Amino acid sequence: MALELGLKGRTALVTGGSKGIGRAIARGLASEGANLVLLARGMDALAVTAGELSTQYGVKALPLAADITKTDSVQAAAEAARAAFGTVHIVVNNAGNPMRRTDRQILWPDTDWIGDLDGKVIGSLRITQAFLPLMPGDGTGRIINISGTASTVVWAPALTHGMNNAAMNQATGYLAHDLASQQITVNTIVPGLVGTEGRQAWADTMAKQQNTTKEEFLAGFCKRMGILTGRWATMEEVADTVLFLASDRARYYTGAKIIMDGGLNVNVRPA
């Protein structure tokens, strides 16, 4: 029996939707017939992505340049989405600042801490608050947050990155409780290491530096990290998890934190 997801004709918002994981999520949703509201800070790549997905899948795709750290910008995006679609069924909070691998983050000025949190967890709350009035109360409303294993594993020295991810996980539970009466489910996907364009480029560089193949470097890296599957996740695998949580098949899931890290969380140690 085919797994019908029931997403055709629904509208999904994806933040950070112009590239990387966000673009893969947007493509997955479009492939299931969902219309799209795509948000990112820059319009150029966003417009290209929206045009490609609209042409390929025959869906409507609205690109909106917006900054999730600015309340006015987020509210303007919500009003544009209302004008275009009226209803937004699915909100995917994917946008976030890149991990900054800087030593001694405790010595940063507090404006840097606040800026990093503003660009992920606080910005995601702004998005949720602004788009909530557009979401239906008929059981099809879905809020899907993207955090990461830095919520539970210390990726030194990425202090604010870990704080952001842990806060996203915790906010999910609170929002699931608050929005249950509106029949809106709220869940978090907790990916481990994902083979984004940037991470693939890093692996290429490291392999060259170590005079080995990329495949050999990645095999050794995953073994050292304790990734039981022996590889990174693909962006499409993250998107597939979003599709399930967005679908009618996930009606009973709320407040969940879906770990997809290839077994990294198992944390195996020799006996």
Annotated model-derived regions:
Residues 89, 109-125, 144, 161, ...:
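Catalytic Tyr-X3-Lys loop
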Residues 97, 144-167, 172-181, 192-194:
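Catalytic loop of short-chain dehydrogenase/reductase
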Residues 11, 18-20:
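Conserved glycine-rich cofactor-binding loop
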Residues 2-3, 20-21, 102, 153, ...:
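Short C-terminal tail/terminal secondary-structure segment
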Residues 125, 188, 211-253, 260-262:
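C-terminal helical subdomain
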Residues 133, 177-178, 251:
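Alpha-helical segment proximal to the catalytic Tyr-Lys
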Residues 180, 185, 253-255:
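Short, small/polar-rich loop/turn modules that mediate ligand/substrate recognition or access, typified
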Residues 75, 98-114, 157-160, 270-271:
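Conserved mid-core segment of classical short-chain dehydrogenase/reductases
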